[in-house]
Amino acid sequence: MHIKKGDNVKVIAGKDKGKEGKVIATEPKKDRVVVEGVNVIKKHQKPTQLNPEGGILETEAAIHVSNVQLLDPKTNEPTRVGYKFVDGKKVRIVKKSGEEIKTNN
């Protein structure tokens, strides 16, 4: 998957189109990502010992990885992701500028 945890992304399709946020979690087997502040849903929580009140919680739901695009770290514009081998290691690069993407989990 070309999107990693900690990446800044922009939503390019769906009800939250145009919103930007940081990737909180990835689900590679399902091709889904959870983005901070995007696709917020209300979850009804039963009372438990940890949360005796229960109630309605707002949380982010996962969206498909094809609906988000990585933001270029320098220009802050959406860009595609490419791969390149540097010193025998596969690294992600920004297609627009050719710059290496630093993974900051």
UniProtKB/Swiss-Prot annotation:
It comes from the Bacteria. Keywords: Ribonucleoprotein, Ribosomal protein, RNA-binding, rRNA-binding. One of its GO terms (molecular function) is rRNA binding. Gene3D superfamilies: 2.30.30.30. The keyword Transit peptide does not apply. InterPro entries: KOW, Rib_uL2_dom2, Ribosomal_uL24, Ribosomal_uL24_CS, Ribosomal_uL24_KOW, Translation_prot_SH3-like_sf. PROSITE patterns: RIBOSOMAL_L24. PANTHER family: MITOCHONDRIAL RIBOSOMAL PROTEIN L24. One of two assembly initiator proteins, it binds directly to the 5'-end of the 23S rRNA, where it nucleates assembly of the 50S subunit. One of the proteins that surrounds the polypeptide exit tunnel on the outside of the subunit. This is Large ribosomal subunit protein uL24. It comes from Staphylococcus haemolyticus (strain JCSC1435). The gene is rplX.
